[in-house]
């Protein structure tokens, strides 16, 4: 995996990704709320960071019941851009949390068959974020929802 770094604005990438996924969310009666506090200009691979946003938001749409809400927030905290993607979905059981970024790991095999996917999306997210010298973490309460936090250095 190689990066093509250039000066970019992370907020633009977030907005574009949300507009690409909005039709999918609307089909399920879901709302994607975008809260951008800072534009977050950075030297990074915009295509790869779009893939990070897409993979996490698409998962949120898949695992959030019809009528649910996905919130995408971006702010600059210190020297980092902090992107939070939260949903009101089914959540992830505590015992599965340490494994969500593992290749081919699926939290719920039965649910996976109906939602599709390969189990690679979040491992790709972690790989891309690490190549940008950032971190990605997950917090979840089973039955209440999940929040993924991506932290990336801003120049």
Name these PLM-found stretches:
Residues 4-8, 26, 31-40:
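Conserved catalytic submotifs in the C-terminal HATPase_c
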Residues 10, 91-102:
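Short helix N-cap motif at coil->helix boundaries in the Bergerat
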Residues 15-27:
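Short alpha-helical segment within the cytosolic histidine kinase core of two-component systems
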Residues 60-61:
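Short helix-loop "hinge" at the ATP-lid/N-box region of the Bergerat-fold HATPase_c
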Residues 67-79:
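Short beta-strand/loop element within the Bergerat-fold HATPase_c
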Residues 87:
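Acidic ATP/Mg2+-coordinating residue in the GHKL
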Residues 133-134:
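Conserved glycine-rich
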């Amino acid at each position: 995996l190689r990066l093509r770094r250039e000066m970019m604005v992370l907020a633009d990438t977030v907005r574009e990704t949300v507009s690409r996924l909005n039709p999918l969310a609307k089909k399920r009666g879901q709302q994607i709320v975008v809260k951008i506090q800072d534009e977050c200009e950075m030297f990074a691979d915009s295509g790869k960071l779009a893939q990070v946003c897409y993979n996490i938001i698409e998962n949120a749409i898949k695992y959030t019941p019809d009528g649910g809400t996905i919130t995408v927030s971006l702010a600059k905290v210190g020297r980092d851009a902090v992107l939070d993607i939260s949903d009101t979905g089914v959540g992830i059981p505590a015992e599965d949390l340490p494994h969500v970024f593992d290749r081919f790991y699926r939290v719920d095999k039965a649910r996976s068959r109906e939602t599709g996917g390969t189990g690679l999306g979040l491992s790709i997210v972690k790989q891309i974020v690490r190549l940008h010298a950032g971190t990605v973490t997950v917090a979840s309460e089973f039955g209440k929802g999940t929040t993924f936090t991506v932290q990336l250095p801003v120049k």
